[in-house]
Amino acid sequence: MSNEHIVWHDSSITKNEYQQKNNHKSGIIWLTGLSGSGKSTIANAAARELFEQGYQVTVLDGDNVRHGLNKDLGFSDDDRKENIRRIGEVAKLFVEQGTIVITAFISPFQEDRRIVRQLVEAGEFHEVFVKCDLNVCEERDPKGLYKKARNGEIPFFTGIDSPYEEPAAPELVLDTGELSREESKQRLVDYVKEKAK
């Protein structure tokens, strides 16, 4: 069956109605950065604080999504693009339901992030660059991935033998080589609360 026979089904509840009930705007908070930069840690800590303050929030994490929805994808450039495309579409559905979606994905290519930005309305996508020098990420190496990549056990590893394209103009930069975990989380929480008004 081709897509031409599939019709979009509008929800009986509008995004505006969800936002009014939640008392905040929805949007995508897209954390991007190298493995080990702190994306997942910051995303989950910020989500916890926002949730405790009454915000409708969810986290989409790169590793978790690859256990289910994207378990069929590898790490070639094409598979990485498809990974981000799928996540963008899922995040868009959450935005339409009035939710603040915090994503934690390496998402190494600028073009892929640009495409996700275009899925939602202006002002609903917020690119957050979780900046951290490669050597610091390698020192942290919480999953032992850099060591494996350096030993040739993991091909196409971002930062080692696959490029990472830093955001040209992110809405927020969290330099986790300089900021503590708590400082990074608080800056993100403050940013989200300001944009969700």
UniProtKB/Swiss-Prot annotation:
Active-site residues per Swiss-Prot or TrEMBL entry: 107 (phosphoserine intermediate)
Pfam families xref list: APS_kinase
Pathway: Sulfur metabolism; hydrogen sulfide biosynthesis; sulfite from sulfate: step 2/3
Single GO MF descriptor: ATP binding
Domain of life of the source: Bacteria
One GO term (biological process): hydrogen sulfide biosynthetic process
UniProtKB keywords: ATP-binding, Kinase, Nucleotide-binding, Phosphoprotein, Transferase
Its EC number(s): 2.7.1.25
Catalyses which reaction(s): adenosine 5'-phosphosulfate + ATP = 3'-phosphoadenylyl sulfate + ADP + H(+)
Annotated binding of ATP, by residue: 33-40
Keyword Electron transport: no
Family statement: Belongs to the APS kinase family.
Function in brief: Catalyzes the synthesis of activated sulfate.
HAMAP family: Adenylyl_sulf_kinase
Protein name: Adenylyl-sulfate kinase
Classification of source organism: Bacteria, Bacillati, Bacillota, Bacilli, Bacillales
Gene: cysC
